[in-house]
Amino acid sequence: MNAKNAPRLLLAGLGLAWAGSGWAGQSLEQIRYALYKDPSADVTSDLRALAERGDLASKQLLGDVLANSDSANRQDIVSLYQEAFADGHGQIPALASLARLLDRTPRLQRSHEAWVRQALARYPNDRDPRSTSTSLEVFLVYPQLFPGERAAELLALYEQSCLLNCRPELYRAVVAERQGDRAAAERWYQQAARIDPRGIERYYRFLGERQDPAFLAFARSLEPEMASLPVEVVQRIGALLDSIHGTTRAELDAEREQRQSRAMGPKVEPTPEQLARDKADDQLRADGIAEAQRWLDNAVARGYLPAQVSKANFMISNPTEHNAEQAQALIAQVRAKDPTRAKALDAAFYMVNNWLTLDPQKSQALIDELIAAHYPDAQLLLGDLYSKGGLDQPDQERALAIWQRQAEQGSTAAWYRMATVHLRGRAICHDPVKAYTYARIALDLGETRARGLIKRLDKTLPKDDIERALAARNDLLKEATL
């Protein structure tokens, strides 16, 4: 055989082998490039095909893609990372990806500690920069698995060997916290929060009981620097501020409900003090919404897709504060980057009763297309359509049945939707105990929006009802595969 033709014949043979096996998808390198060009690119099917062929790197990347969806089953993602890690013989960074997922999912964090402990013993924790950074990622979630000064030693190695994209601040913060130096830990957490979106949530948790007022003060100190902060950080701060202010609004709602329930009977005109208090509360609500939206609007103006999606959802959820034209213009921006995500926003847009664009049939047609395309949140949207009465009257039983199936498959957003319907849904007998149960599960699985709902119910539910809700939550978590 001519040596010059050997490579060509080899490539032809490989091509025949792929063709013979029926493979027509993208290679892993092509998928990585597609995600580099568009982080929201739909690559799940091609990654699944590669993962099913046993490609460990594809399993890790598939896990990373699914981890960004609220609808993906968290236990399935854990399994992908574990398979990619392959007892330390495969993708070592898959353990870091697993740690990042578990950091956002408290319940899974507790149940997988033993496996992670064993995994740390399956590879040299400081063999090279990649294994060292992986070990430090695990340390962030399970600091108790690193005795003595081991974490500080790994951090020193990381700082010596890291050449690109080095971010030791969050590691330094947790090391200082473990060493009992809270002042140093807070300084490092604040530095981490300026450059790393994960640092924001970690700093918020570090603040403990004073977390809401302390984080608000920190965010306000950063507001003059907003334009120079990474857009991912700006988006995450806006989301956390929205959660904090949402919790405040929930507490104000609970207090108002309690006051109104005590005033049952003949109507009594509110006192000047009550009127002044209600006015102050309304101003507090408005100021909180405006503060969170300033951060979100900055990220939107910089073309950040997750912020554009969040803003569009905010407009759809608050139709009296925005108009249909504003929402459509923003959805058009999303469509230019992610047509499928824009279609999902359109489906929600056409459910809005307050706008003349209301078109439930069009919404249903779009949802049907999304279901046919296996869009992860399509079933959630279908539940929304029934819950809002888009096709007739509100059908909460049908909506709850759809969301229940999604919740059983691991959707955190489905648990949250069920909680909100049981608390304040139309055309259903409200059940605050069930609402508390589902909200706690949602929070356990990383759904931060549930915080406000829980705070509201903490103020209104009797202690016995809360205990019943927590017992039910524990039973459901034992039964569920999440």
Spell out what each predicted region is.
Residues 2-10:
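Bacterial N-terminal signal peptides that target proteins for export
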